[in-house]
Amino acid sequence: MSVYAIIGGTGLTQLEGLTLSESLPIETPYGAPSAPLQRGRYAGREVLFLARHGHPHRFPPHQVNYRANLWALKQAGAEAVIAVNAVGGIHAAMGTGHLCVPHQLIDYTSGREHTYFAGDIEHVTHIDFSHPYDEPLRQRLIEALRALGLAHSSHGVYACTQGPRLETVAEIARLERDGNDIVGMTGMPEAALARELDLPYACLALVVNPAAGKSAGIITMAEIEQALHDGIGKVREVLARVLAG
C-alpha cells in the first residue's frame, strides 16, 4: 500500500485524528520545510502530514519553501501526495463550500523557486506536464466524494496567482477568459516539483470565497475563516475515505 502524504493548506495546519508516531525535523538541500513532518496513522493507514504554511500558520504563499517541502516528503518515504488548497470560486458552480478536484492548472506566479533543475547540475530534464495531476489519484478523491454524497466538481482549471493579496476584478475577468474555474496561490510550483520527484500528486480544493467581482461585496478574512471552519470537516471526511479505501 502506498504511503500517502497530505499537505494541509490554510485551515488545515494539523490533521485531527492522526495518531502521531513521530515528528520529523528533516533538513534538505533547499533548507527546512515549512514545519516538521508528522508521521502517524490516519484512518488505519500510515500517512505523512505537512502544514504548508507552517504550524502555526506563518508563511504566506509566495514565501513557502515548496522545494524543501516536497523533497522532505519524498525523503521520508511518501509515494503519493494529496494537497489540500483553499481557493476562490470563479465559475458559477464553484460556490463557497464547494469541493473541486481540478484536472488542469495555469501558473501566473513569478519569482518562486520552481524547479530542482537549477544551479550546478549534470543534466537538465524537461518533465512532461501536459496533465499536471495524477489521474488515478484524482479518481480516488472523486470516488470518495461520490461515496460521501458531497457536492463537488470532478474537473476544473486552477489558476495559481502570486499573492499574498487577493486579485482585482479585472484580473479575475482575465482568469475567467483564460478558462479558469478556481483561483488560489499555492498550487504552483508544488505540482511541478512533485512531478520532478516522480510523486503522484492531486489537489482537493475547498472554495472559501467568491472571487473578486463574483459577489456584491468585498472579500473579507472573516468570510474566508468562516468558510474554512464550515468546510474543513468535509475535507477530513474525504481524506479519511481515500486512506481507508
From Swiss-Prot:
Site entry (Important for substrate specificity), positions: 167, 221
Gene Ontology terms for molecular function: S-methyl-5-thioadenosine phosphorylase activity
GO BP term, pick one: purine ribonucleoside salvage
Disulfide topology: none
Catalytic activity line of the entry: S-methyl-5'-thioinosine + phosphate = 5-(methylsulfanyl)-alpha-D-ribose 1-phosphate + hypoxanthine
A GO cellular component annotation in the UniProt record: cytosol
Top enzyme class: transferase
Gene3D superfamilies registered for this protein in UniProt: Nucleoside phosphorylase domain
InterPro entries associated with the record: MTAP, Nucleoside_phosphorylase_d, Nucleoside_phosphorylase_sf, Purine_phosphorylase-2_CS
Pathways involved: Purine metabolism; purine nucleoside salvage
SUPFAM superfamilies per UniProt: Purine and uridine phosphorylases
Residues binding substrate, per UniProt: 185, 209-211
UniProt entry keywords in alphabetical sequence: Glycosyltransferase, Purine salvage, Transferase
Domain of life: Bacteria
EC number(s) given by UniProt: 2.4.2.44
Glycosyltransferase as UniProt keyword: yes
Residues reported in the UniProt entry to bind phosphate: 10, 52-53, 186
Record-linked CDD domains: MTAP_SsMTAPII_like_MTIP
Additional information: Although this enzyme belongs to the family of MTA phosphorylases based on sequence homology, it has been shown that conserved amino acid substitutions in the substrate binding pocket convert the substrate specificity of this enzyme from 6-aminopurines to 6-oxopurines.
HAMAP family according to UniProt: MTAP (MF_01963)
NCBIfam families the UniProt entry points to: MTAP, PRK09136.1
Sequence similarity: Belongs to the PNP/MTAP phosphorylase family. MTAP subfamily.
Functional note: Catalyzes the reversible phosphorylation of S-methyl-5'-thioinosine (MTI) to hypoxanthine and 5-methylthioribose-1-phosphate. Involved in the breakdown of S-methyl-5'-thioadenosine (MTA), a major by-product of polyamine biosynthesis. Catabolism of (MTA) occurs via deamination to MTI and phosphorolysis to hypoxanthine. Involved in quorum sensing.
PANTHER family xrefs: S-METHYL-5'-THIOADENOSINE PHOSPHORYLASE (PTHR42679:SF2)
Summary of subunit composition and partner proteins: Homotrimer.
Protein name: S-methyl-5'-thioinosine phosphorylase
